[in-house]
């Protein structure tokens, strides 16, 4: 294991290399007088060997190591707390600006998924989601997104029998498309063969429907897409997801269709996320309506039993009602699954992430 550098007293004008994707690292290194191939060497040290001490990077020239020390540093925010569920799910908590964000690790037999946060809090105020009730502080930097993966990988290699992360989902705290540039840069690092080296189909970005940003994403990057729909019509969606009053279902799904036409990662269809709320969006007629609005969009529907959080005014649909709802959709030809609750006992399940946020949004 490599000895870590002391990051105290680092000047603000130094660059955290975890904020830079490949192209940006290459430009930075060229400015230091390094050759282009040094980009690969440096990224391997950072992401494959988890080394944040330039002095230990033995295949870099001494003068380049000196310049790197003078102009930059490598710092991944530490996890300050770990909670482990009876089902093996792990919640890691990171302190940023004296606030807390949450990262979830979900191990399964054939895969291991890391759910990362993209913002400190969330501004969308979806009524069924704990994160939305906490308010919003700021976007995470690229390094703060990447730190979650960097630290998780490090822990898994050291403590969990050399386990690896096979999938990364942007389904933690925040709306990824409201932090578009930083999320795209982070995804580039995740995709890079000398970064985390995941394929585009193993990275999932979930959005509640920020239509202009989704339209921009079409030209920027191709990853698996999940849409937080949660209602079959605008009337219901307006009542539980205020963002729908700005970007309604029709405009959202039109944007999704455009993305799918340009995507190789979504050949199997977009994942439609639908939280099950008793008496609100779970009736047979809602299933029929959902099938109708999705009939022209290749999709897989994931029904999510609602997870309780304090002061919420919802009740989860019964198992029987969820099964009936799922079967209606299956008869209409949709690949429909029911999400298994993971990490519910440690507040790590879908919609339960709260962190500790200083809200900067005025009501």
From Swiss-Prot:
The keyword Magnesium does not apply. GO terms for molecular function: 4 iron, 4 sulfur cluster binding; metal ion binding; rRNA (adenine(2503)-C2-)-methyltransferase activity; rRNA binding; tRNA (adenine(37)-C2)-methyltransferase activity; tRNA binding. S-adenosyl-L-methionine binds at residues 174-175, 206, 228-230, 307. The active site is at residues 102, 350. PROSITE patterns: RADICAL_SAM. Pfam families: Radical_SAM (PF04055), RlmN_N (PF21016). Its cofactor is [4Fe-4S] cluster. GO terms for biological process: rRNA base methylation; tRNA methylation. Residues 108-349 form the Radical SAM core domain. Signal peptide: none annotated. PANTHER family: 23S RRNA METHYLTRANSFERASE, RADICAL SAM CORE DOMAIN-CONTAINING PROTEIN. Reaction proceeds by a ping-pong mechanism involving intermediate methylation of a conserved cysteine residue. Specifically methylates position 2 of adenine 2503 in 23S rRNA and position 2 of adenine 37 in tRNAs. m2A2503 modification seems to play a crucial role in the proofreading step occurring at the peptidyl transferase center and thus would serve to optimize ribosomal fidelity. HAMAP family: RNA_methyltr_RlmN. NCBIfam families: rRNA_mod_RlmN. Belongs to the radical SAM superfamily. RlmN family. This is Dual-specificity RNA methyltransferase RlmN. It comes from Buchnera aphidicola subsp. Schizaphis graminum (strain Sg). The lineage of its organism: Bacteria, Pseudomonadati, Pseudomonadota, Gammaproteobacteria, Enterobacterales.
């Amino acid at each position: 294991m490599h000895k870590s550098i002391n990051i105290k007293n680092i000047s603000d004008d130094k660059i955290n290399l975890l904020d830079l994707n490949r192209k940006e690292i290459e430009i930075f290194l060229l400015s230091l007088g390094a050759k282009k191939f040094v980009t690969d060497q440096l990224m391997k040290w950072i992401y494959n060997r988890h080394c944040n001490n330039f002095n230990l990077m033995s295949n870099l020239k001494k003068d380049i190591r000196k310049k790197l020390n003078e102009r930059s540093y490598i710092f991944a925010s530490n996890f300050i707390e770990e909670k482990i569920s009876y089902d093996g799910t792990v919640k890691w908590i990171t302190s940023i600006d004296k606030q807390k964000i949450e990262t979830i690790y979900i191990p399964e037999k054939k895969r291991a998924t890391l759910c990362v946060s993209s913002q400190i809090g969330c501004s969308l105020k979806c009524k069924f989601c704990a994160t939305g009730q906490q308010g919003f502080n700021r976007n995470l930097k690229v390094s703060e997104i990447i730190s979650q993966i960097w630290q998780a990988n490090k822990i898994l290699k050291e403590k969990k029998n050399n386990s690896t992360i096979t999938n990364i989902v942007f389904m933690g705290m925040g709306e990824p498309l409201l932090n578009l540039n930083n999320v795209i840069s982070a995804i580039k690092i995740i995709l890079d063969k000398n970064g985390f080296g995941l394929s585009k189909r193993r990275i999932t970005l979930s959005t509640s429907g920020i239509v202009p940003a989704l339209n921009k994403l079409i030209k920027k990057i191709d990853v698996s897409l999940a849409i937080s729909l949660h209602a079959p019509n605008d009337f219901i969606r307006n009542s539980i997801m205020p963002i729908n009053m700005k970007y309604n279902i029709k405009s959202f799904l039109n944007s999704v269709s455009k993305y799918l036409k340009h995507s190789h990662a979504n050949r199997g269809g977009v994942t439609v996320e639908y939280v099950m709320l008793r008496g609100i969006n779970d009736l047979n007629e809602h299933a029929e309506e959902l099938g109708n609005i999705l009939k022209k969009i290749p999709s897989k529907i994931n029904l999510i039993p609602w997870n309780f959080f304090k002061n919420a005014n919802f009740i989860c649909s019964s198992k029987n009602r969820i099964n009936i709802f799922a079967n209606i959709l299956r008869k209409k030809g949709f690949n429909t699954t029911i999400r298994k609750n993971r990490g519910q006992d440690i507040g790590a399940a879908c919609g339960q992430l709260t962190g500790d946020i200083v809200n900067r949004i005025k009501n």
